[in-house]
């Protein structure tokens, strides 16, 4: 049986500003968007007068089964809950492993992804972890992507003392395997790269792009503030760059928006990941935990403190991410798309 809702008088950023309109929802889809919408069937009415209606946020870097911790087994971090996500406007997540492949598995990751889906969220995940050889479910990166519905790419670490110091040829082969599997399964097949502060930077990736036929969009560096100049060089060749939300991110995003095309810039939270603090000799001296709320907090600061317009700011966690990950039903307020919606009171913006 179909269930209908009409959201009335919302100021819609789709993410572009389309003014005050009504939205008709049938089950989990938006089926009409227009001013003064007339609908005669039984339905629930939601008065959104004085509120902004924007797409649900897409967070493409979430430790949904908790990060590994890097200060002993007692520092293992708890798994995320659906309520942790939706209370901060996140309606779609991509889960992944980090340094924790010895104590947590791809099986656990896929199971948690399925659990979030059962609870009503849109959820995906990545095979792999920091390490090479790559941790997989089927024994093959390509088969994981091709045959496991939830898996849309692979995770690896570069330029970090905790990585496996992957060789250029290993990264190139990983990318081609992901690309081929992604084409077969109609998935992005991304190589999602934790990028540390190591001496190598993006050197190997930039050389692969220069020396091979692998499209630069196959590689998706995150934590790009760690190697900002290399990230700009990468973006100048057409690559996507993903920032990690923290208190310094809004000003860096503002700077980047003046240099890099908007569509290539995304933001993620690293929620429930471990945030180790290192001294100059790479000894651990402290530990933090990534928080889901930093995603929206960074966008809010980008609007209020850096004076970036609302449409541009929210694109970084909605449309841009959806387009980059081939999530065609996500990321914008349009007829026929998933009804992943966030309502914001004016006080929030």
Regions found by a protein language model. Name each.
Residues 42-49, 82, 140-145, 250-262:
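Short amphipathic alpha-helices and their capping/turn segments at secondary-structure boundaries
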Residues 347-349:
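Conserved small/polar residues in nucleotide/adenosyl-binding loops
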Residues 10, 28, 50, 61, ...:
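Divalent metal-coordination and catalytic microenvironments
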Residues 48-111:
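Metal-associated gating/positioning segment near the N- to mid-region
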Residues 99-110, 121-214, 221, 226:
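Buried, small/hydrophobic-residue-enriched core segments of structured protein domains
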Residues 162, 177-278, 284-285:
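Active-site core of metal-dependent hydrolases
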Residues 261-344:
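His/Asp/Glu-enriched, well-ordered alpha-helical/loop segment
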Residues 1-5, 11-54:
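Histidine-rich, glycine-flanked metal-binding segment
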